[in-house]
Structures are given as C-alpha cells and as structure tokens.
Amino acid sequence: MESAKGKLGVMCVGLGAVTTTFMTGVLMARKGLAKPVGSMTQYDKIRVGRGKDKKYLHYGEIVPLTSLDDIVFGAWDVYPANAYESALNAEVLKDRDIEPVRDELKAIVPMKAAFDRNYAKRLDGDNVKDCKTRWDMVEALREDIRRFKAENNCDRIVVIWAASTEIYVPVDEEVHGTLAALEAAMKANDTEHVAPSMCYAYAALAEGAPFIMGAPNTTVDIPAMWEMAEKTKMPIAGKDFKTGQTLVKSGFAPIIGTRCLGLSGWFSTNILGNRDGLVLDEPANFHTKEVSKLSTLESILVPEEQPDLYTDYYHKVRINYYPPRNDNKEGWDNIDIFGWMGYPMQIKINFLCRDSILAAPLLLDLVLLSDLAARKGRYGTQRFLSFFLKSPMHDYTQGEVPINHLFQQYVMLKNAIREMGGYEADEEID
C-alpha cells in the first residue's frame, strides 16, 4: 500500500452549508478546539483477532489514513462567497465555532462552477464557467484540478460532490452504456443526457482522483463511468449521503424484518429550509431524491422472501421546503406494522436533526477511505462505503441487488478495513 504521507487535496463541488461545516470542523479539530464526533475514521474501533489475540483498534491503527493536518481544501461553487462568508450565511455553526479558523476559511475561495441552470433551476449564482459544450466543462475542470494540485503541493486529490441535487436523468443505454458513447455525447453537447455532475466525475477520474457522489444524481452509477474508473484505476463511490431519516430507516427496518413482523406501510416526510430544501422544492429535482430515498426498503423487507409479511406495503416519501427551519431538518416516520394473527400496530419516529452536522463526518470518512482505497490499488465501485450512502451503487446490469441493511453494511465496512490492514474478514458484529 502506498504511504498516507504528503498533502491530500480535498476538492468539494459546492461550498454551502454541508461543505463549510465539514471544513470548519476539520480546521477546528486540527487546533484541538472541536471534536470530530460522528466520524467513524476518528472514533470507531474494529476488533481484530480472536480469543487471547483479540484487540480493538481504531481504523488508523489498522490502515494508514491521511492525517487531518495534511488536508488541503478547495471548492467550486456557483456563488463567489469564500468559505468564511458561506459558513456565516449558512447559519449552521455559531460564530464562536467559526472565528478561530476565520483566516483559513477566508483563504478558500471557490473556483467557477461547471453549471447548467436547467439542472438546478432554483439556483441563480453567476460564478460559473463559460463553456460551449460538456466536453469544454470537462477540460476546464481538469485544468482546475491540475492547477489546484500544483499550487498547493498536493500529493493526491479526492473530489467529492456536496452540491445540490440535479434533476432526474434516467439511464440511457445508448449514451451511458459505454465510455466511448458518453465521451461522444459530451463532445456533441448532449445536455439532456450528460449532467454537469458527470463532467466533474469524468474530470476527477481523468486526473487520477477518486470521485464521491454525495447527492442522488445520476453520475457515477452508469456503466460508462464504471468503465472510466476501471480505465483510470480509480475508486468511485455513491450515492447520496445517508444522514437522517434514511439512516434511521436502514437501521430500523432490519428490526422489523429480524422479528418477522409484517409491514403495511411506511410514510416519511421532512421539513427542511436550507439551500438543499430550496432546490428540492422543484419537482424535477425532488424526483431524483425521491427515487433514492424510496430504494432503501426494497432490499431489506423483500416481498419475494416473505410474501405474507411484505407484499404490497405502501411506501411514500415527501420533503417540504420550510425556510424557518433552515438547516435544522425534522423528519417524521409513521410505520404501520402487524403482528400475531395480523393485528395492527404503529411506530412513530420524530427525528429533529441538524442536516449538515450529520453530513460533515460522512464527508470526512468518505474522503479518507476513498484515498485509502486508491493507495491500496482498489478501483471501481467501492461497495464497502455503502454504510455512508442512501442509495448504494451496484451493477444493476447484472441483476445485482444493493445492500441497504445498515448492519450488513457495517460488516462490509469493517471487513474491508480488516483486509486492507492484513487481517482476516469476520462476519460477527461486536
């Protein structure tokens, strides 16, 4: 495995609430002024060995992870505000938690974004590249990555999407089925089938950087990008950060399934007032998120495996834009279940959470573990990162079923760390 020493450039697509919360937290942690609570790479321990040889180790004691001190931040955004201004505007963190790293945040000025307003109609920023074709976007982004890497003396780069959800792009086999077809579509400026996010992913992989899709966009979950990842020998991960309601769902649905209780319906609704909520208020963008959030139950409570329990259950997801809440998302779940002799029961879950506070540690873990995977020589879809994602990538062309079960995902994560560290895989959870 290649060394974790040297600078790691973390280039974020989007410099809004999630990204600035992530950056501020890392910068504060470096100064010993805050703790990166929620980060698996910083807190979780994995058992290695058995019996008298058993011990519990942090991830960084099993595999070489990049130090927080070696991270260098960069970003693209449609708005020109620097990270300090953006963090204040987001109103996620208190001023007292931003001011100690004010100078570092001010130095993070977003590059012009590769942006198509048709993909996010509620955004009106003008800090955008003037590109005639999607291929021009790719070339401009590649130049950004090369320049950032050189100017900051970075040894490695990871690119992560933390920007808004794009409109839904159905997978088109003719365009998305092969790398050659996708490249041709980019050069022909096929704006219907080639989303801006695909340009970021292509540019990252072409420049030898892993790419992580943190939104539910159709981006790296297409055969053309799998081919690109294999060609460049780079890891890809996606999609959609699993922060609040879906985290609860992927952890609670296994309780219903393990106990062999039946499900009649699961209704989920949210209120959210940040920029993400604004974009999702557009029906075409919400549909992208809806598809992602609806996919969670399908592989956990499977009708074909338990027809008496899970046939024809009703599953509905809604997100409502409500500005007074800003980043403080609230999720309600009403779960109608049935038990012995078919008698009905209900479960109610009310999760008052902070969207960016839950997302920030996911960005850190996904960045560090994607960099680890690249240094280990792993490439293509990194299924072990499914733990952090709402809609885990899978090869649907071969009938592969995604793993959404939180505890199965946790076993996958730990075993990947064990194996990369030279230890044996283990199916037990402890």
Question: What do the predicted segments below correspond to?
Answer:
Residues 17, 77-80, 242-244, 267-273, ...:
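Glycine-rich beta-alpha junction loops
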Residues 217-232, 271-282, 299-308, 326-339, ...:
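Short flexible/disordered coil segments
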